[in-house]
Each structure stands twice: as structure tokens, then as C-alpha cells.
């Protein structure tokens, strides 16, 4: 699996844990994994999305 797909999978797992299971700590873990890959790929819109998702967790 390439890094881009892996980051996307982590985003989806984070979303599922956040909105379906209400497991915020678990969700945060996946969003941070996605962010790390996004930063390695230097993809600004993916980085922004990951940071936004992390911010929403902390806001709630």
C-alpha cells in the first residue's frame, strides 16, 4: 500500500472512531498517524485536513 492510501485509510479510521464509536482518543491516534504521512508527502491540503480533524477533537 502506498503512503497516500495509507494516510487516507488512517483518516477514515479516525473518522469512524470519532463519529461512529465516539472513541476520541483512538480517533486522535489515527489522525496523528495520517498527519505524519501527510507531512512526509509534503501535501498541503492533506496536512490541513489532518490538522483540522485533530483540532475538532480538541475542540470537543
UniProtKB/Swiss-Prot annotation:
Gene3D superfamilies: Tetratricopeptide repeat domain. InterPro entries: TPR-like_helical_dom_sf. This is Uncharacterized protein RC0022. It comes from Rickettsia conorii (strain ATCC VR-613 / Malish 7).
Amino acid at each position: 500500500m502506498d503512503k497516500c492510501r495509507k494516510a487516507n485509510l488512517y483518516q477514515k479510521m479516525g473518522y469512524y472512531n470519532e463519529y461512529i464509536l465516539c472513541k476520541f482518543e483512538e480517533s486522535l491516534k489515527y489522525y496523528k498517524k495520517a498527519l505524519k504521512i501527510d507531512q512526509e508527502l509534503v501535501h498541503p491540503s492533506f496536512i490541513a485536513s489532518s490538522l483540522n480533524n485533530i483540532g475538532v477533537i480538541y475542540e470537543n
